[in-house]
């Protein structure tokens, strides 16, 4: 994306503030005209005081300098007041719009598919969000406070200078050409270099975030020095790339300062020669020196503007790349909110592929009736998780249809669909907020009594009550202030509060010890009552009582039946069971069931 297109898009993001933007632009136009009244009036006053020797296009017949001085004061007051008003409203516009864009960006990335987040580091997304919105804020603020007025000033100044004295105006044009050529060359030379610098900034942010997110691993394996050295290496590489860019722009500063000094001297030299020939007045020489000073100031502002756009361009490009990422699924224009569903789930000839070559799910068909528990088993990559992801529309199938209560899930709003589906993940996901806040994710308006009931049913109330702050206890980052079992039981309580007709359990007890697993299983039994439940199972012991088990291989269901039926067939499932020593333990487990029930009752 070219810098011109990039900057145009920056201005287009003003959106609802466009009206104020046009008002500020008009105010800047008035300022651009008013600013040149000062050098013109200054020159005319000098001519009047020196005996009305003006010979240029702006000859004056005013005999007294006082009217000119009064006009100068009036223009000065207008410039001061208008500049203050522009600065005030530009500040407010930039701050309001930065917060609006930041919120919009956050909402956008939260809607992007899990595959996008899997392949993109969260630290990088945070860096892009903060640096991108800060860059937008700086450009908006600079544009309306300085840069636009500077550009308009150049548009006004050069024709005015030609009108007053074209001979002296040529010197100003030469100065503009030097600035333009030099800036263009440096931008062309350093544009790709600055892009590499921003890539290093992203790597630095991602590496630091990665290390901080795994600080326990770093400390336990004595990797602090290694991580610091790695970060220092990235920082050194960043500086090595940044220094040449800074050197080029320092060269621009040196050459432009030299050019401005030479231009002022040239105006005096040419002006004196013209004055001796009667082609200009002392006032016009003074006026053009003021023009040159003002032109230099505006050119430096324009160069600063170009430099700021250039330096911000890679950050903005990265920001827009994220903003342009398209969510995998969206609401259809005619999508409906289904309110509460019953939970009749039907897959009909469903196929889906991530890469368009190898099917992740192929011709999948099955029905889950309300209240049934459907277990999905199979090797990693067999298609279990993909099938469930299609159910709650993380993706849409390339062929086939998924219906709930006879309604195509694609005809439902995403919010309405997902409100009817609860998920208990293998790793309990908690916010760094209070226990109450984490529970209310399931039901935002839940009362304390409802939370207590849900926590009790999920075997979580005891440990909540033991903490000093009870439901106000902070769970810590990713729930690290709680044990694995406590986190999982809170996750189950959250699902109970949500009270969805369809429940997804992603091997919710795989990482727990036996005692904790017993408590969590009791909680799971409670949350599964009366719901259509899908269990993604790796440990076959957890699905012994499932209504039906679907065995996946290469994206297809190769076996289907109850636990005992599949064992009796001596097929793929039976082989999996033997690998997990299930067959030998089946009779023993059946005999021990009453004892387990009694033990569970005692634990609860």
From Swiss-Prot:
InterPro entries in UniProt: AAA+_ATPase, ABC1_TM_dom, ABC1_TM_sf, ABC_transporter-like_ATP-bd, ABC_transporter-like_CS, P-loop_NTPase, Type_1_exporter
Transmembrane segments: 22-42, 68-88, 146-166, 168-188, 238-258, 285-305
Sequence ranges assigned to domain ABC transporter in this UniProt record: 345-579
GO terms, molecular function: ABC-type beta-glucan transporter activity; ABC-type oligopeptide transporter activity; ATP binding; ATP hydrolysis activity
Residue ranges of every copy of the ABC transmembrane type-1 domain listed in the record: 21-311
SMART domains xrefs: AAA (SM00382)
E.C. designation(s): 7.5.2.3
Localisation: Cell inner membrane
Reactions catalysed, as given in the entry: [(1->2)-beta-D-glucosyl](n)(in) + ATP + H2O = [(1->2)-beta-D-glucosyl](n)(out) + ADP + phosphate + H(+)
The keyword Membrane belongs to this UniProt entry's keyword annotation: yes
Keyword Transmembrane helix tagged: yes
Membrane topology: Multi-pass membrane protein
Keywords (A to Z) from UniProt: ATP-binding, Cell inner membrane, Cell membrane, Membrane, Nucleotide-binding, Sugar transport, Translocase, Transmembrane, Transmembrane helix, Transport
UniProt record similarity statement: Belongs to the ABC transporter superfamily. Beta-(1-->2)glucan exporter (TC 3.A.1.108.1) family.
Protein's job: Involved in beta-(1-->2)glucan export. Transmembrane domains (TMD) form a pore in the inner membrane and the ATP-binding domain (NBD) is responsible for energy generation.
Quaternary structure, from the entry: Homodimer.
Record text about domains: In NdvA the ATP-binding domain (NBD) and the transmembrane domain (TMD) are fused.
UniProt name for this protein: Beta-(1-->2)glucan export ATP-binding/permease protein NdvA
Species this protein is from: Rhodopseudomonas palustris (strain BisB18)
Gene assigned in the entry: ndvA
């Amino acid at each position: 994306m070219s810098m011109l297109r990039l900057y145009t898009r920056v201005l287009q993001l003003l959106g609802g503030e466009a009206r104020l933007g046009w008002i500020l632009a008009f105010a800047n136009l008035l300022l651009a005209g008013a600013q040149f009244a000062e050098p013109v009036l200054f020159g005319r006053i000098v001519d009047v005081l020196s005996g009305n020797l003006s010979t240029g296009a702006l000859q004056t017949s005013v005999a007294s300098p006082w009217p000119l001085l009064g006009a100068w004061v009036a223009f000065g007051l207008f410039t001061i007041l208008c500049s203050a008003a522009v600065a005030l409203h530009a500040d407010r516009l930039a701050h309001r719009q930065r917060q609006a864009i930041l919120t919009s960006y956050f909402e956008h990335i939260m809607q992007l598919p899990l595959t996008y987040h899997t392949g993109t580091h969260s630290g990088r997304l945070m860096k892009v969000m903060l640096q991108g919105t800060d860059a937008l804020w700086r450009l908006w603020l600079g544009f309306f406070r300085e840069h636009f007025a500077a550009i308009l000033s150049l548009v006004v100044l050069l024709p005015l200078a030609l009108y007053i004295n074209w001979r002296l105006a040529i010197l100003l044009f030469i100065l503009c050409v030097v600035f333009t050529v030099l800036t263009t060359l440096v931008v062309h030379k350093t544009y790709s270099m600055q892009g590499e610098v921003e890539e290093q900034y992203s790597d630095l942010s991602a590496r630091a975030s990665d290390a901080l997110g795994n600080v326990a691993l770093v400390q336990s394996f004595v990797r602090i020095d290694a991580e610091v050295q790695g970060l220092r290496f990235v920082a050194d590489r960043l500086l090595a790339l940044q220094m040449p860019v800074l050197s080029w722009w320092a060269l621009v500063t040196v050459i432009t300062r030299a050019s401005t000094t030479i231009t002022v001297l040239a105006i005096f030299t040419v002006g004196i020669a013209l004055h001796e020939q009667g082609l200009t007045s002392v006032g016009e020489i003074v006026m053009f020196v003021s023009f040159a000073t003002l032109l230099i100031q505006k050119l430096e502002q324009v160069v600063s503007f170009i430099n700021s756009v250039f330096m911000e361009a890679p950050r903005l490009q990265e920001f827009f790349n994220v903003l342009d990422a398209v969510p995998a699924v969206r609401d259809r224009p005619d999508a409906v909110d289904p309110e509460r569903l019953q939970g009749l789930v039907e897959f009909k000839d469903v196929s889906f592929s991530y890469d368009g070559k190898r099917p992740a799910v192929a011709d999948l068909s099955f029905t889950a009736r309300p209240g049934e528990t459907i277990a999905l088993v199979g090797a990693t990559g067999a298609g279990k998780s993909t099938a469930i992801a299609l159910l709650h529309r993380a993706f849409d199938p390339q062929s086939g249809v998924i219906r709930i209560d006879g309604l195509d899930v694609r005809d439902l709003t995403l919010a309405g669909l997902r409100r009817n589906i609860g998920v208990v993940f293998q790793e309990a996901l908690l916010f760094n907020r209070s226990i109450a806040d984490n529970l209310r994710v399931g039901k935002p308006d839940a009362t304390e009594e409802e939370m207590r009931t849900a926590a009790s049913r999920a075997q979580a109330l005891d440990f909540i009550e033991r903490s000093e702050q009870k439901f106000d206890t902070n769970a810590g980052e990713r729930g690290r202030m709680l044990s694995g079992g406590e986190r999982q039981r809170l996750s189950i309580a959250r699902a109970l509060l949500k009270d969805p007709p369809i429940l997804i359990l992603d091997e919710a007890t795989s990482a727990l010890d036996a005692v904790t697993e017993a408590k969590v299983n009791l909680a799971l039994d409670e949350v599964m009552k009366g719901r259509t439940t899908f269990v993604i199972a790796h440990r076959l012991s957890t699905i012994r009582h499932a209504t039906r088990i679907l065995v996946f291989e290469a994206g297809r269901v190769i076996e289907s039946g109850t636990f005992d039926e599949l064992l009796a067939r001596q097929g793929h499932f039976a082989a999996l069971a033997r690998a997990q020593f299930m067959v030998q333990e089946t009779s023993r487990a059946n005999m021990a069931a009453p004892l387990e029930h009694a033990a569970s009752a005692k634990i609860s």
